[in-house]
């Protein structure tokens, strides 16, 4: 499995044809060796996507370029997933991190949603999906939560995920979308992404204040104050922020994609953290053995790797195969209104994902077929609209990993924890974010 991130890193640093086909070969070998770990449903879905790719590929004017882009997208997601998981596993072993997560759910009920939403930006934004899973696992251990309080807490985590997926480089969302736009950089997207993130957080807190049945609940004697939470958690948050700052500065200083910096440094950071936890003379040897053990457990990720690679290739090929007349008609209908164009991009991604299509596949298809020129949008607004649709699609569709995790840990049916809990939020988020991006486009043009 380590070969795929290594070749992906080489391709990010020095993109060449041999690195792409090396990634493809390494992926095929890995999946073939670990095929017994792949669920039958994943095999069937991936086979269907490969079949669609094979049928459409000969019809494209540049089939090789489309296939190479799909391979790069799939390998980038797999590489980020593996390397960030090494770091998050090491972080989960830190006692202070576990204690801080536990105290998040002892905040007074009227403030709990906002605190959890904000905390998700740190744990999820800097530890990846494993950080989100850690927050859900901790919520599941809280036996004193009513059904409505539990629904509110898990909604705070999932909506926080939708918000952080707009800005965090730890997720494939940002990395994949940047790979679709030549010349786009994370630092250039960050200000707008953070503005929409803040919008999502405020919107979620407002909805919880208005409709949360817990808003008049009594404060328990053991409730944790915000001051105590900050006092206990600042070393953890400072460490997370320090690592993110290091990656950003390294990326800007060396002129490298931030995805390359993450893939290269996350395993090293995990090794150092494991060494710190063990302490003593034998710490470095123990850290190496722990890192090797964590890496060996990733053989069970063959299903995810298969799905990512199949979705990446199918998304770019399908997007390239959609007739230009169709996309031109859509572009002509919405090009006069930047807000309507952004709303169209995000809404189509959400609707496609609600129809059981993988959110990543939906985002790649829409981003590749409805390009900025057709819709009359700057790249920044178009890119952000794709991110908005992708993030919201993940939390409203019952078919995503986040929805499945939330249902498993909460015990709430998956349809209720996804569509039932987030439908109103997603509708409002689509409208308000499109209005914000439309205003941004008009200000940029002024």
Where are these regions (language model features)?
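Hydrophobic mid-bilayer segments of alpha-helices in multi-pass membrane transport proteins
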Residues: 2, 17-58, 77-84, 237-242, ...
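Core transmembrane alpha-helical segments of multi-pass membrane transporters/permeases
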Residues: 62-94, 117-121, 286-323
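Membrane-interfacial loop-to-helix junctions in multi-pass transporters
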Residues: 76, 102-115, 146-153, 301-304, ...
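Helix-loop-helix module between adjacent transmembrane segments
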Residues: 118-127, 156-166, 315-316, 349-355, ...
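Membrane-interfacial helix-loop connectors
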Residues: 134-147, 176-184, 335-395, 405-410
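Membrane-core helix-loop-helix motifs of multi-pass transport proteins
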Residues: 144-237, 404-436
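Transmembrane helical segments that form the transport core of multi-pass membrane transport proteins
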Residues: 243-362
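Juxtamembrane boundary at the C-terminal end of a transmembrane helix
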Residues: 434-446
């Amino acid at each position: 499995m380590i070969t795929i991130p290594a070749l992906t890193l080489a391709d990010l640093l020095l993109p060449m044809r041999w690195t792409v086909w090396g990634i493809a070969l390494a992926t095929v070998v890995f999946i073939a060796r670990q095929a017994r770990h792949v669920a039958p449903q994943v095999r069937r879905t991936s086979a269907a996507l490969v079949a669609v790719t094979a049928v459409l590929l000969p019809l494209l004017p540049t089939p090789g370029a489309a296939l190479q882009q799909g391979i790069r997208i799939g390998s980038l997601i797999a590489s980020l997933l593996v390397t960030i998981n090494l770091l998050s596993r090491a972080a989960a072993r830190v006692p202070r991190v576990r204690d801080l997560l536990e105290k998040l759910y002892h905040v007074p009920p009227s403030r709990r949603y906002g605190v959890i939403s904000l905390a998700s930006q740190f744990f999820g934004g800097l530890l990846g999906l494993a950080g989100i899973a850690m927050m859900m696992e901790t919520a599941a251990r809280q036996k004193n939560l009513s059904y409505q309080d539990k629904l509110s807490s898990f909604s705070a985590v999932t909506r926080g995920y939708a918000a952080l997926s707009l800005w965090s480089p730890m997720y494939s969302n940002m990395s994949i979308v940047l790979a679709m736009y030549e010349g786009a950089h994370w630092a250039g997207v960050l200000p707008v992404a953070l503005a929409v993130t803040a919008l999502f957080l405020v919107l979620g807190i407002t909805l919880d204040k208005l409709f949360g049945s817990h808003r008049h609940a009594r404060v328990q004697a053991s409730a944790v104050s915000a001051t105590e939470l900050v006092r206990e958690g600042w070393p953890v948050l400072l460490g997370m922020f320090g690592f993110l700052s290091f990656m950003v500065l390294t990326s800007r200083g060396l002129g490298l994609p931030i995805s390359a910096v993450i893939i290269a440094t996350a395993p090293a950071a995990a090794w150092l953290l494991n060494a710190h936890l063990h302490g003593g003379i034998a710490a470095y040897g123990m850290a190496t053995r722990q890192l090797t053990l964590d890496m060996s457990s990733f053989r069970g990720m063959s299903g995810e790797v298969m799905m990512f690679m199949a979705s990446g290739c199918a998304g770019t090929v399908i997007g390239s195969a959609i007739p230009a007349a169709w996309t031109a008609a859509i572009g002509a209908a919405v090009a006069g209104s930047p807000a309507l164009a952004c709303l169209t991009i995000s809404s189509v991604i959400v609707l496609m994902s609600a129809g059981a299509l993988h959110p990543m596949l939906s985002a790649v298809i829409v981003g590749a077929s409805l390009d900025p020129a057709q819709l009359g949008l700057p790249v920044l607004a178009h890119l952000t609209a794709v991110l908005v649709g992708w993030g919201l699609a993940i939390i409203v569709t019952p078919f995503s990993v986040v929805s499945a995790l939330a249902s498993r840990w909460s015990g709430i049916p998956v349809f209720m924890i996804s569509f039932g809990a987030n439908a109103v939020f997603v509708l409002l988020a689509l409208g308000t974010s499109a209005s914000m991006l439309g205003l941004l486009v008009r200000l940029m043009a002024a």
